[in-house]
Amino acid sequence: MVRGIRGAITVEEDTPEAIHQATRELLLKMLEANGIQSYEELAAVIFTVTEDLTSAFPAEAARQIGMHRVPLLSAREVPVPGSLPRVIRVLALWNTDTPQDRVRHVYLREAVRLRPDLESAQ
């Protein structure tokens, strides 16, 4: 069975370093929150960035932490007027039998505003 784990984080500036650091932080917290022990458990990871983030691909950061064999995709988020700026979003597809209600989604920094309904928004 495949489950989706959602996450998002904001960055203060559009630099490769900021995007890579935030992406690594978010991915590692998503894995930890869900008890994922090996990247082999991941079917794929999809990243989106808001249109104001253009200096780096989030997928590069995933490779930096060892996700060399996980299919990765970076794309641009829909530019909705008034939406939160400088956001990196993630959808990780996880091969697991974990029930849907036990999957922990992770929202960090200003991105907690995107999902105030979730306990795991930190």
Swiss-Prot record:
This is Chorismate mutase AroH. One of its GO terms (biological process) is aromatic amino acid family biosynthetic process. The keyword Cytoplasm applies. It is an enzyme of class 5 (isomerase). Pfam families: CM_1. Pathway: Metabolic intermediate biosynthesis; prephenate biosynthesis; prephenate from chorismate: step 1/1. Catalyzes the Claisen rearrangement of chorismate to prephenate. Probably involved in the aromatic amino acid biosynthesis. InterPro entries: Chorismate_mutase_AroH, RutC-like_sf. Its main location: cytoplasm. Coiled coil: none annotated. It catalyses: chorismate = prephenate. GO terms for molecular function: chorismate mutase activity. GO terms for cellular component: cytoplasm. Its EC number is 5.4.99.5. Optimum temperature is 70 degrees Celsius. Homotrimer. The keyword NADP does not apply.
